[in-house]
């Protein structure tokens, strides 16, 4: 165990110690967890106030810094004042002991994870590790192990002093509870209720599936690549109502992400990304080991189970009870839910119309939407002697789209049969785990998305819709399902996309038109929205949304 590179990379961010090839909790933490596992008659943990003290004592045993008083007070506020006495008693009689028992198993769950990590896919690293920026790779975690990780977060048992230096998001729940105490809101309480419901479901029946977390990287194409693209535009489905997570098409679902995965999920945030992390809490596990995304990176998560229903958005968000996820499993026991996190530029204002910003956004979407099965279908694979990369080339030239490290030996070009024996690693892993199985299951997946980078991020909805359409088309996605959420600026989206498709425009055609429009906006030569500029015959002219 001590010689495992993956374990050594993540161990500084875990509350465990390693001795004689085994993982352990410190003795005093074991004592506290054992007492809690036997119920309040042994541990005396029968209120939020006592739970707060138990968390304080365990963190002190781990030599961690003291939590802010507001965080500790948040636990007491929730369990002693907000929820009713019957629910509170159930938590201290049943859920807290079950979570403590789960944490006692945490070291052995991790050991089993690392024992199995090298056998999931031949030649591919899948063990829990820090996936640093510009380090493409994938991690497979069992839902049971994820439950233990989130239990650590609930009890604030992850070391947090060293996370900032690695640009890692927060992972403990202290800020979540502090926000509840400092400035109570029903939406914040509902976020916590989603997580409570997850733990209640987990403790009643431990799930047996797998969730994968992948950092994807592309070498970003330049503007000339996009201008000259002759790829046809994919189909475009407009939905004025409905939610991305309810899409029926088995499409890739877009998380309008912060560059720090999860954004404000574990603090006060309550918009699209944060809501998704509350109703699919297993997504939070990625915040442990995935540092912030660079401009050429995306994070794809496959298999996260949904546990909660909800209503509302932002301040009106409310927990609405149980959700039973009926998604089928793939050959790796992952639910067929694929979520990709891509972060847009924040408050771009007029910068949004500059070529460099448009290029940044389209390449970010390209990385997120890349469907490896389609990429391989149209490419040949070469391995260069003496370097550590697989390169995708098309028509004998480097496409500039993808590069990634591999653990396979360097050799001459691989044919399709050889490719099944020597699997490509990291960001080209997806869809190539099992020859003819995962490929076929996902080769026709579209993209389900919406107003990415708009709202609080300040992006232009018409340009952002166009950018995502271009990226989806370039990556050979068969369609986009676009959820407008009733945004007025997109009322003509269906009409415009149908007109463009009827004229058989290519990716390059639409990209060049968008560049021309953006230049006119920058130089104040037009004040109308992109769609009205493109189609002056629209019944009602869209006045351009003025950047704040």
Curated annotation (Swiss-Prot):
The keyword Hydrolase applies. Changing residue 262 to E: In tej; loss of function. It catalyses: [(1''->2')-ADP-alpha-D-ribose](n) + H2O = [(1''->2')-ADP-alpha-D-ribose](n-1) + ADP-D-ribose. The keyword Cell inner membrane does not apply. Keywords: Biological rhythms, Hydrolase. Its EC number is 3.2.1.143. Pfam families: PARG_cat_C (PF05028), PARG_cat_N (PF20811). Signal peptide: none annotated. GO terms for biological process: carbohydrate metabolic process; defense response to fungus; DNA damage response; regulation of DNA repair; response to osmotic stress; response to oxidative stress; response to water deprivation; rhythmic process. InterPro entries: PARG_cat_C, PARG_helical, Poly_GlycHdrlase. It comes from the Eukaryota. One of its GO terms (molecular function) is poly(ADP-ribose) glycohydrolase activity. Poly(ADP-ribose) synthesized after DNA damage is only present transiently and is rapidly degraded by poly(ADP-ribose) glycohydrolase. Involved in establishing period length of the circadian oscillator. May regulate post-translational poly(ADP-ribosyl)ation of an oscillator component. Belongs to the poly(ADP-ribose) glycohydrolase family. This is Poly(ADP-ribose) glycohydrolase 1. It comes from Arabidopsis thaliana (Mouse-ear cress). The gene is PARG1.
């Amino acid at each position: 165990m001590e010689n495992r590179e993956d374990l050594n990379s993540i161990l500084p961010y875990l509350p465990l110690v390693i001795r004689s090839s085994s993982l352990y909790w410190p003795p005093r933490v074991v004592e506290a967890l054992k007492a809690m596992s036997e119920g309040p008659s042994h541990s005396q943990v029968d209120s939020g106030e006592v739970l707060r003290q138990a968390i304080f004592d365990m963190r002190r045993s781990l030599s961690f810094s003291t939590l802010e008083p507001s965080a500790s007070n948040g636990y007491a506020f929730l369990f002693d004042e907000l929820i009713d006495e019957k629910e509170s008693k159930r938590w201290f009689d049943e859920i807290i002991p079950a979570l403590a028992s789960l944490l006692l198993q945490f070291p052995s769950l991790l050991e089993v994870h690392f024992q199995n990590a090298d056998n999931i896919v031949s030649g591919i690293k899948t063990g829990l590790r820090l996936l640093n920026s510009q380090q493409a790779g994938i991690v497979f975690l069992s839902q049971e192990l994820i439950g233990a990780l989130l239990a650590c977060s609930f009890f604030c048992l992850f070391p947090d002093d060293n996370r900032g230096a690695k640009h890692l998001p927060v992972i403990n729940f202290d800020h979540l509870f502090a926000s509840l105490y400092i400035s109570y809101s029903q939406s914040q309480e509902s976020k916590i209720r989603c997580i409570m419901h997850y733990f209640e479901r987990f403790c009643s029946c431990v799930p047996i599936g797998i969730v994968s977390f992948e950092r994807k990287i592309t070498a970003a194409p330049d503007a000339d690549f996009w201008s000259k693209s002759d790829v046809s535009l994919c189909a475009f489905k407009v939905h004025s109502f409905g939610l991305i997570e309810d899409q029926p098409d088995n499409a890739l679902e877009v998380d309008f992400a912060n560059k720090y995965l999860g954004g404000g999920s574990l603090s006060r945030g309550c918009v699209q990304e944060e809501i998704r992390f509350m109703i699919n809490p297993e997504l939070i596990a990625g915040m442990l080991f995935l540092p912030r995304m660079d401009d050429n990176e995306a994070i794809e998560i496959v298999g996260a189970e949904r546990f909660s229903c909800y209503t509302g958005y932002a301040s009106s968000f409310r927990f609405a009870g149980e959700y039973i996820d009926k998604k089928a499993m793939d050959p790796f026991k992952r639910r067929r839910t694929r979520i990709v996190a891509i972060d847009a530029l924040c408050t771009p204002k007029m910068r949004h119309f500059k070529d460099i910003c448009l290029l940044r956004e389209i390449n970010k979407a390209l990385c997120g939407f890349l469907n490896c099965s389609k990429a391989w279908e149209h490419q040949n694979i070469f391995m260069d002697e003496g370097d550590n990369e697989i390169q995708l080339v098309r028509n004998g030239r480097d496409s500039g789209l993808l590069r990634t490290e591999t653990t396979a030996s360097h050799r001459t070009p691989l044919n399709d049969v050889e490719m099944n024996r020597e699997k490509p690693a990291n960001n080209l892993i997806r869809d190539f785990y099992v020859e003819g199985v995962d490929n076929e299951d996902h080769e026709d997946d579209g993209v389900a998305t919406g107003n990415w980078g708009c709202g609080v991020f300040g992006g232009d909805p018409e340009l952002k819709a166009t950018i995502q359409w271009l990226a989806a088309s370039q990556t050979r996605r068969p369609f986009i399902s676009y959820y407008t959420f009733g945004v007025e600026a997109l009322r003509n989206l269906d009409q415009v996309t149908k007109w463009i498709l009827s004229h058989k425009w290519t990716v390059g055609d639409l990209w060049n038109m968008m560049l021309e429009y953006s230049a006119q906006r920058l130089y104040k030569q037009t004040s109308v929205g992109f769609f009205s500029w493109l189609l002056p015959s629209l019944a009602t002219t869209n006045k351009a949304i003025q950047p704040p």
